[in-house]
Amino acid sequence: MEELQRYLKMDRSRERDFLYSLLFQEYIYALAHDFGLTKSIPYESMQILSYDNKYSSLIVKRLIIRMYQQKHLIILDNDSKNKNFLGHNKNLYSQMISEGFAVIVEIPFALRLVSSYQGKEIEKSINLGSIHSTFPFLEDKFVHLNHVLNILIPYPIHFELIVQNLRCWIQDASFLHLLRFFLYEYHNWNSFTTQKMKQNSLFLKENRRFFLFLYNFHVYESESIFLFLRKKSYHLRSTSSIAFLDRTHFFGKIEHLKVVFRNDFHTMLWLFKDPFMHYFRYQGKSIMSSKGTPLLMKKWKYYLVNLWECHFYFWSQPNRIHINQLSNIFLNFLGYLSSVRPNPSVVRNQMLENAFIIDISRNKLSTLVPIIPLIGSLAKAKFCNLSGQPISKPAWTDSLDSDIIDRFGRICRNVSHYYSGSSKKKTLYRIKYILRLSCARTLARKHKSTVRSFLKRLGSEFLEEFLIEEEQVLSFILPKISSSSQRLSKERIWYFDIIRINDLMDL
């Protein structure tokens, strides 16, 4: 780690010219290993995204020696008949190199991030990466808007465009050649850039950090067209937690690129002047909302398509951008079904001896839990059937009782924690009921007993020990509100420590 810190202090003129040599440094692979170990966060289970169980310094040393001896990376050749290298699978070494590659390629962007902070009073907050930070923004802004553009983020016609764009940031030719080698080696770029990414286990487990970096760089390029929008649009809360580039360019990209776009598109900007335009991104989609007319939204739609295709060479089609009216649709994003609905209320106005009853209707953001997809996920994980009837989990009956309770408790807390912002809690209570009864049936199956006799013998209190409600947690933090727990259970609660949704979607 000290060696990396010394490297980061190098002169900026040399920062991008000697990255390839870092592949032969052992501490780079140790950093990639530590990234996988420190991935976990509160209320989330740790995913083994790297080669944690197989990592050792001896394997890394053998890998480096082999790279020194070879003129090219034969160890990554999938066409080779020999799938073992020094007693280990070649996939492991390919994986290790790609993880180390991801650590190295972030160095120039880390230097730019540090330099962007110098001489500026910018608040450094980890809350910018929270998924829940998006919803307070929606509550404040969306209720005053009319239309929304649902955009599927376009992807490059060829991954060589990504390499060409990176040449502006990285000047090490050997490093860029290695990047091309990796992209041709995996030859599955379309699955990575589209929504089929989840189906490709290679990107999910073995090379996640490497491909997420490339994906975020691609998204940054596609989003740079919004740099000419009003300055307040730049200060939206970040919705991407893994995006190293988002943090790097959150402040820096405004200064470097806005002059270029002003020069290129000043003749068209007057068509799209809209002080109420807002933008945010989630997963592989993005949303632009406005208070303007449908005609203005259509102009934005075709302007974006033409600009992506002609200026950035990104493949896009008009049918990938949908125009909807906020009052007529549900936005399905980040695990919630969100909509803007009128909220009528009656106000009594007293003026001297006269009293007036005034009906007021204000828009309110409604956030609902999607019950059908959640039950589908629970059924896929064998916690219930497709109709939502809880069943036992036979695969866990070999574990200790405490381990079984801990597993069910963790899943229940994850769901409760993430969906604490739901407007209606009944759906959330149903999910909790399924998990509780599935846990009881799993324990009863293990002890060859019925659920009723098992609960009667041990009591139902043992389930309450790990299924802690949100209001009980808050009662420890804010004792004054413990008396109004019934009212609190109906309130929406947003947390700023949730930076992943994968565990909640896949359970």
Swiss-Prot record:
Highest rank taxon of the organism: Eukaryota
Main location group: plastid
Name the UniProt record assigns to this protein: Maturase K
Similarity remark: Belongs to the intron maturase 2 family. MatK subfamily.
GO CC list: chloroplast
Species annotation: Ranunculus macranthus
GO molecular function: RNA binding
GO biological process: mRNA processing; RNA splicing; tRNA processing
Keywords: Chloroplast, mRNA processing, Plastid, RNA-binding, tRNA processing
Coiled-coil portions: none
Function: Usually encoded in the trnK tRNA gene intron. Probably assists in splicing its own and other chloroplast group II introns.
Listed PANTHER family: MATURASE K
Keyword Chloroplast: yes
Subcellular location: Plastid, Chloroplast
Gene: matK
